[in-house]
Design a protein with these regions (language model features):
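Aromatic- and acid-rich polysaccharide-binding/catalytic face
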Residues: 1-26
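Aromatic- and carboxylate-lined catalytic core of secreted/periplasmic carbohydrate-active enzymes
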Residues: 19-147, 155, 159-174
Length: 174
């Protein structure tokens, strides 16, 4: 229940010491938690309990909201106030990427959300149609339109430029 991943291993409060986990964290060096560790923790629980709500709470948890969302977690504290985005993300499922440089949520008839931590090219498969491409600042939730309308025929290669790592939202237009 109180286990979580850190950069140097797993945090687990000592048993039988009559201390609350927060007290135990003060006594030891708790370590740092990164996007990858938070993602891994939520993904493991989501896989083990697919029909349950999975929440995440650990050291610096508000900063890990995007990791929670991208791993399929419930109720992350992201700051995006776009109703269409929230509607789209609720329909999407996690798509395995086998890399820590980016994570994807996809529903082929709705679009995709890509969280990229480094520049490069990312392939996204969606249904044929017209889409818009938007960039979301992960810390502020500000939505910036990059391409108002373009056509996709199955495969779209998203190019992440240097210095523009973050959240990309590919939204299907009606």
């Amino acid at each position: 229940r109180y286990l979580h991943y850190k950069t140097d291993g797993i945090y687990a409060p000592g048993g039988g010491k009559n201390m609350a986990p927060r007290q135990h964290m003060r006594k030891i060096k708790a370590g740092k938690i990164t996007f990858s560790e938070a993602y891994k923790a939520v993904e493991e629980y989501r896989t083990k309990y697919p029909d349950k709500a999975v929440t995440y709470y650990a050291q610096n948890y508000p900063a890990m909201a995007w990791a929670v969302l991208m791993a399929g977690g419930s109720c992350p504290s992201i700051f995006v106030h776009d109703e269409t985005f929230l509607s789209d993300v609720a329909k999407m499922k996690v798509e395995k990427t086998d890399t820590d440089t980016y994570k994807k949520l996809v529903k082929s008839d709705t679009g995709a959300i890509v969280y990229s931590q480094s520049p490069g090219e990312i392939s996204v498969f969606v249904d044929d149609g017209k889409y818009s491409l938007k960039y979301i600042d992960p810390s502020s939730g500000t939505v910036e339109v990059l391409n108002k309308s373009f056509k996709i025929s199955g495969l779209y290669v998203l190019k992440i430029p240097e210095g523009k790592e973050g959240v990309y939202w590919i939204h299907k237009l009606k």
